[in-house]
A protein has these predicted regions:
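N-terminal hydrophobic targeting/anchoring segments and the immediately downstream early-domain regions
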Residues: 261-299
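Conserved G/P- and acidic residue-centered "switch" motifs that form tight phosphate/ATP-binding loops
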Residues: 129
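Histidine-centered catalytic micro-motifs
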Residues: 192-197, 229-234, 271-279
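N-terminal beta1-alpha1 cap of cysteine-dependent amidohydrolase-like domains
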Residues: 1-126, 137, 144, 148-182, ...
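Hydrophobic, aromatic-enriched interface-forming segments
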Residues: 132-134
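Protein kinase-like catalytic core scaffold
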Residues: 217, 226-228, 270
Length: 299
């Protein structure tokens, strides 16, 4: 439906209602927002890229309420961790160094929990900038609080003054990686706005790209899960009409569609694997569709 310039809501409503049966059910992608100055915000590149990839973006406000987090995860088909402030180093067992910049306590705990809970549920995940650091910290990896003071050697410029929608340095993608498959090449020019970075990839992850100075630019799951994190800001490019980074968002949307289909299938079909050759007997009022400590159903 195109935006009407006639200010006729009845016409718009009737047109939308008429086309509703033809609409394709798009996957729902959850995005973490940036909470500061008593405002929840989301930069346009994120939702523009998700919409252009054919998915529906929905933002999650900051909360540590377990019921809200679980309800959110039960409804989405994919998850995108957005950029933002530094991560509190106490979450990866380090004391803050002098070069640490602003941290956001409203986001840290929520996003670290979300990462683990989403991975448990096989929800496809894309982490961007701070998001790749969230993924790494959530699963036991380490971070550089400041690459300029903690990494040896000469650094290239990782905090460009150039407009965010233009690339400022190149990265090398690991052969055979998921990222190489998505991008279709081994060298990519990216933008850069960070001073923290992944130090060592978490267990269950591999490094899939580095900058020329050795800074880790991407990690991905080695366990067959649809989890990928990148250090640059791919969402910015579309705002300049540059679609070179859209493969990342198409990948997330494709994986989210597959996950949505799997959820729908599993909601109708129950598979029971006892892992034993002897008969099993269950007491009355057992409900296999929910967790039960007596039978340890894994959902």
């Amino acid at each position: 439906m195109k935006t009407s310039q006639k200010f006729n809501i009845d016409f718009d409503y009737n047109e939308l209602h008429h086309d509703a049966p033809k609409a394709v059910q798009a996957p729902l992608i959850g995005l973490t927002g940036n909470f500061s100055d008593n405002k929840l915000s989301l930069l346009p590149g994120y939702y523009t890229s998700i919409l252009k990839a054919g998915a529906v973006p929905v933002i999650l406000p900051p909360t540590e309420d377990a019921d809200i987090l679980i309800s959110f995860l039960n409804r989405i088909d994919g998850l995108l961790f957005t950029g933002g402030a530094d991560i509190n180093p106490l979450f990866f067992q380090e004391e803050p160094i002098r070069e640490l910049q602003d941290i956001n306590p409203y986001r840290d705990r929520q996003e670290l929990l979300l990462a683990r809970l989403a991975a448990d549920r096989q929800i496809p995940i894309l982490g961007i900038c701070r998001g790749v650091q969230v993924l790494n910290a959530a699963f036991g990896g380490s971070l550089y609080q400041d690459i300029h003071s903690q990494m040896e050697g000469t650094r290239i410029k990782h905090s460009q003054q150039l407009d965010r929608s233009f690339a400022s340095h190149t990265i090398e993608i690991e052969p055979g990686s998921l990222l190489e498959k998505i991008m279709g090449c081994s060298h990519v020019a990216v933008n850069s706005f960070h001073h923290q970075a992944v130090r060592e990839a978490a267990p269950g992850f591999r490094v899939s790209a580095r900058a020329k100075d050795g800074v880790i630019e991407a990690i991905e799951s080695t366990e067959g899960k649809s989890i990928l994190g990148v250090q640059w800001h791919p969402e910015c490019f579309i705002l300049n009409g540059d679609e070179s980074m859209m493969p990342l968002f198409h990948w997330l949307t494709h994986e989210a569609k597959s996950f949505a289909k799997a959820k729908e299938l599993h909601s109708r079909i129950l598979t029971l694997d006892s892992h034993c050759d002897t008969p099993m007997f269950f007491h009355e009022n057992i409900h296999f569709e929910s967790r039960d400590p007596k039978i340890k159903v894994d959902l």
